[in-house]
């Protein structure tokens, strides 16, 4: 007769859960603080609003587990602004993306990086911040999956980070674009694209975050 512990482990495996160690992991929210103010943004606004609920839940679970959250954000051409002004701009009711930005707005405990281009790594302090935090695994989420999320994933892969990209926490202009981006991340970049509800944060006994030399 199988022991009860073995049965429980088998049940969890059959449920398709993905264990994610707390130590060495960071949650990255890419361009979720976003005014979404461009021609033809209506469909993306709708998709982003649907994405906000599972992403907010994932962030809550990550924070409770002790996983740091880093906002990677465009400055929308406001070169004299800081992140606080960017948030204020995006949560204003005049912004098409204000519902998403309000639901996913950062807290005082979160980190943020402003990016000048598509990738969160290009000409930013992200790599240095991740190294300082001892991060070797990144959970990539946000807007748009086929552009900024994918560009960031490419750069993360080239820097030997393990990639998670929960499919329900990433949106693009079209479903086809999003599916293509997720396939690229899953197949080419060897990332895990399971839905966020399958990610299970756990603390390994005696584990320590590994820093690169």
Label every PLM stretch briefly.
Residues 1-26, 57-65, 89-213:
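Active-site-adjacent betaalpha module
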Residues 1-4, 41-44, 85-87:
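Short, basic, glycine/proline-bearing loop/turn elements
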Residues 23, 41-73:
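A short alpha/beta connector and helix-capping loop motif
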Residues 26-36:
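Acidic-leg catalytic submotif of subtilisin-like serine proteases
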Residues 31-33, 75-76, 117, 144:
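Short, flexible active-site-adjacent loop segments at beta-strand->alpha-helix junctions, enriched
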Residues 35-37, 77-84, 102-112:
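Short, basic/glycine-rich phosphate-binding loops at helix/coil junctions
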Residues 68-69, 74-88:
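Early exported N-terminus immediately downstream of N-terminal targeting peptides
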């Amino acid at each position: 007769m199988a022991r009860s512990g073995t049965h429980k482990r088998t049940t969890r495996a059959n449920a398709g859960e993905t264990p994610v160690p707390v130590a060495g992991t960071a949650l990255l929210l890419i361009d979720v603080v976003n005014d979404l103010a461009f021609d033809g943004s209506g469909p993306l606004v709708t998709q982003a609003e649907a994405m906000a609920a599972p992403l907010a839940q994932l962030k809550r679970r990550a924070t409770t587990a002790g996983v740091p959250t880093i906002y990677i954000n465009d400055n929308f051409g406001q070169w004299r602004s800081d992140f606080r002004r960017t948030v204020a701009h995006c949560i204003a009711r005049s912004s098409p993306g204000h519902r998403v930005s309000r639901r996913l707005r950062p807290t005082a405990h979160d980190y943020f990086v402003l990016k000048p281009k598509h990738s969160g790594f290009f000409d930013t302090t992200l790599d240095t911040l991740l190294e300082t935090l001892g991060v070797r695994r990144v959970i990539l989420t946000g807007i748009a999956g086929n552009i900024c999320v994918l560009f960031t994933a490419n750069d993360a892969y080239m820097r030997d980070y393990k990639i998670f990209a929960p499919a329900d926490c990433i949106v693009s202009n079209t479903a086809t674009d999003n599916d293509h981006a997720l396939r690229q991340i899953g197949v080419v970049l060897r990332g895990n694209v399971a839905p966020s509800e399958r990610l299970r944060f756990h603390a390994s006994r005696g584990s320590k975050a590994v820093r690169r030399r």
